[in-house]
């Protein structure tokens, strides 16, 4: 099949293992209209909704089983899109990053990955728009660590996302790299980044938060994380906050005290379902901005969780 925007190869099969009213459909799509080629793995239930909201991820999907956190969302009509782009490695083998070796090469790989992600997603978004069964106004992102960090670059520089959920991630790239040495991670031969890394840091997400609203951003970090220091996540959110004054509930940072780079496994499903239901529901609109409480009495009233007034609970006059 040839589209105006891409040469697309599609391989699909169905699976009924997850239940629901229709079969799960797994597709592998290759976009080869431009180099490097991109591969998309898609999972969804056809016919559940007229147009699917799509959750984007860097990576791949198994051909017979969606991720555990996603099963309810897929049953409700969400489409999962995991993608990879075949960027060639550096022509100089000595400059290629080594996994978990925190030096200049490793630092450059993250900055370059964020820069590329914002462009790569443009191709993915154009393909999804061409399908006719995807709601292009409800594109979301889910990522954790190495897949969440580039997602925040997409939120500031890529096609408009409706929502993003990023675990143990940061959008303050330079500040994050500066924590590697004090946190005992740095193994570089010198304390300077490469000039090409410095050039790409012009696209550091924290420098472009003015373009992020109204994307609903939820970041969930470990308060004791030494790999992705939570103070850099807070710096990113603090930089974005002035641009969210009209709807501050769209910008949230959750810190788990006592946890580092590994958070409780169950929270991925919990936060993904909650955030995507709230800001990119298959059929419902997102919530309207909440009005500020006009006084202390109103503020206290909003903390009620049932019909009982707090005043009566403590038997105050």
Regions found by a protein language model. Name each.
Residues 234, 242-317:
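C-terminal catalytic histidine-bearing segment of alpha/beta-hydrolase fold enzymes
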Residues 102-145:
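Gly/Ser-rich "nucleophile elbow"/oxyanion-hole loop immediately N-terminal to the catalytic nucleophile
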Residues 10-49:
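N-terminal cap/lid segment of alpha/beta-hydrolase-fold proteins
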Residues 65-67, 71-119, 177-179:
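Cap/lid segment of the alpha/beta-hydrolase catalytic domain
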Residues 148-195:
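Hydrolase active-site cap/lid region
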Residues 142, 167-168, 256:
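Alpha/beta-hydrolase-fold catalytic nucleophile elbow
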Residues 51-60:
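Short beta-strand element of the alpha/beta-hydrolase
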Residues 176-178, 187-234, 238-240:
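The feature captures the conserved acid-bearing segment of alpha/beta-hydrolase catalytic domains
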């Amino acid at each position: 099949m040839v589209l105006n925007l891409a040469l697309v190869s599609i391989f699909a099969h169905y699976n009924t293992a997850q239940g629901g009213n229709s079969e799960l459909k797994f597709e592998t799509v290759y976009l080869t209209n431009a180099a490097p080629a991109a591969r998309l793995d898609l999972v969804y239930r056809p016919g559940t909704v007229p147009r699917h909201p799509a959750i984007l991820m860097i990576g791949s999907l198994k051909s017979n089983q969606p991720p555990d956190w996603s099963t309810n969302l897929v049953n409700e009509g969400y489409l999962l899109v995991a993608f990879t782009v075949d960027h060639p490695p550096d022509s100089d083998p000595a400059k290629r990053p080594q996994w978990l070796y925190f030096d200049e090469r490793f630092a450059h790989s993250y900055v370059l990955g964020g820069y590329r992600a914002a462009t790569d997603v443009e191709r993915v978004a154009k393909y999804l728009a061409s399908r006719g069964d995807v709601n292009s106004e409800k594109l979301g992102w889910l990522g954790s660590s190495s897949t969440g960090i580039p997602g925040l670059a997409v939120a500031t520089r890529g096609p408009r996302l409706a929502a993003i959920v990023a675990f143990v991630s940061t959008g303050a790239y330079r500040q994050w790299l500066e924590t590697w040495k004090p946190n005992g991670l740095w193994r570089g031969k010198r304390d300077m980044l490469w000039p090409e890394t410095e050039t790409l840091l012009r696209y550091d997400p924290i420098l472009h938060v003015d373009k992020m609203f109204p994307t609903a951003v939820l970041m969930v970090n470990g308060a004791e994380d030494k790999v992705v220091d939570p103070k850099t996540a807070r710096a990113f959110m603090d930089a974005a906050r002035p641009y969210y004054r009209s709807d501050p509930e769209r910008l949230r940072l959750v810190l788990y005290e006592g946890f580092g780079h590994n958070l409780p496994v169950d929270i991925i499903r919990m936060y993904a379902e909650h955030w995507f239901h709230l800001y990119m529901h298959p059929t419902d609109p997102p919530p309207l901005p909440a009005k500020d409480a006009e006084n202390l009495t109103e503020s206290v009233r909003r903390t009620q969780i049932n019909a009982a007034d707090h005043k009566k609970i403590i038997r105050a006059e």
